[in-house]
A protein has these predicted regions:
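Metal-dependent C-N hydrolase catalytic cores
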Residues: 1-107
Length: 107
């Protein structure tokens, strides 16, 4: 199981996480400099090299948990991608008390 920042799996389940992260590797309307769709995967790969201890707060924030809620892979049109994001957001927002965030390619 791939986890955010390589955190332990017990801190990466939906039940045990306070943060839900969904990636949207979309690059459908860029006209120059294609590659924004690679951003989310590269971000997750780079997160594995991140220090998990926060020296400024003397805490380990990852213990609050980060759930990877999947990838929105719809690429047929901006409208279809937006609808897929909307549906996934509706699904995950039923989890009260959790922070939902998207990380995309093209913004």
């Amino acid at each position: 199981m791939k986890t955010y920042a390589g955190i332990p799996e017990e801190n990466a389940t939906l039940e045990n996480s306070k943060v839900m992260l969904v990636t949207v590797p979309y690059d459908g309307t860029s006209t120059w400099g294609k590659g924004a769709d690679k951003g989310p995967e590269l971000f997750l790969d780079a997160s594995e090299n991140m220090e998990l201890y926060d020296i400024e707060t003397s805490t380990e924030p990852y213990l609050e948990g980060v759930y990877l809620g999947g990838e929105i892979s719809e690429k047929s049109s901006p409208e279809a991608m937006t609808e897929a994001v909307y549906q996934k957001t509706k699904e995950l927002l039923t989890n009260e008390g959790k922070l939902f965030t998207l990380f995309g390619g093209e913004h």
